[in-house]
Amino acid sequence: MQFNFITIFPNLIKPYFDDSILSRAIKSSIIKLNFINPRDFSADKHLKVDDYMIAGGAGLLMKAQPVFDAIDSLDSTHIIYLTPAGKKFTQNDAKRLSKFENITFICGRYEGIDERIIEEKVNEVFCIGDFIMTGGELGALCMCDAITRNLNGVLGNPNSLDIESFEYGMLESPSFTKPNVYNGLSVISAFLKGNHGKINALKNNMALCKTRFFRPDLYQKLRSPKKQKEKR
């Protein structure tokens, strides 16, 4: 899969891929990266990519021309724009988007991008949460990371995907490692007795409790009549 990042700050993104799982994915040719700077396409003699908003408004906006031309320089691709106005990105989106061969992230700056770019060029609009950031680069990295983990050959143990949070609509159960006792704090005794049926039942119950406490919104969806019917 190829990921394209349209950004005026490519050096904010590149270091994230220098280590760990994503670095291995690049070395294994599972993913490829391409960075496109709108300044390289600016028709302005000073290579400006921003301007004041028509009809007023605070701050500057990324101009249509450089971004249009940056997009047109790419082959066929699925284009995503990161903005607080977008739909919230979820694990289901990550799994779905992992089926694409080529994805492009438009990383906005200032007050965003000219609306005509969204209307004419963008396939999907996402946000990663109800908060404001200085640009779309971190959001694009979050999405790229989540999507990449769903590609074949990226994770050492592909079964890890089956037991992660959100896979079954709830958070993952609490996890422990050795030693069994640390600073007087013990691992749950049932986890040490080898009864896998009881362990799985306990983990499921703990996952439900964790979801109810930390993510009541997810818990309500689990308890909805539609979800209950699906379980049957």
Curated annotation (Swiss-Prot):
**Subcellular localization(s) per the UniProt record:** Cytoplasm
Enzyme nomenclature, EC number: 2.1.1.228
UniProt GO molecular function: tRNA (guanine(37)-N1)-methyltransferase activity
Q: Name one GO biological process term.
A: tRNA N1-guanine methylation
From the record, give the cysteines joined by S-S bonds.
none
Q: Does the keyword Hydrolase apply?
A: no
* A cellular component term, taken from the record's GO annotations: cytosol
Q: Which domain of life is it from?
A: Bacteria
Main site of residence? cytoplasm
Q: Which Pfam families match?
A: tRNA_m1G_MT
Chemical reaction(s) catalysed: guanosine(37) in tRNA + S-adenosyl-L-methionine = N(1)-methylguanosine(37) in tRNA + S-adenosyl-L-homocysteine + H(+)
Q: Which residues bind S-adenosyl-L-methionine?
A: 108, 128-133
Q: Which UniProt keywords apply?
A: Cytoplasm, Methyltransferase, S-adenosyl-L-methionine, Transferase, tRNA processing
Has keyword tRNA processing? Answer: yes
The Swiss-Prot or TrEMBL record describes its family as follows: Belongs to the RNA methyltransferase TrmD family.
Function description: Specifically methylates guanosine-37 in various tRNAs.
Subunit structure as annotated in this protein's UniProt entry: Homodimer.
Q: Provide the protein name.
A: tRNA (guanine-N(1)-)-methyltransferase
> Native species of this protein?
Campylobacter fetus subsp. fetus (strain 82-40)
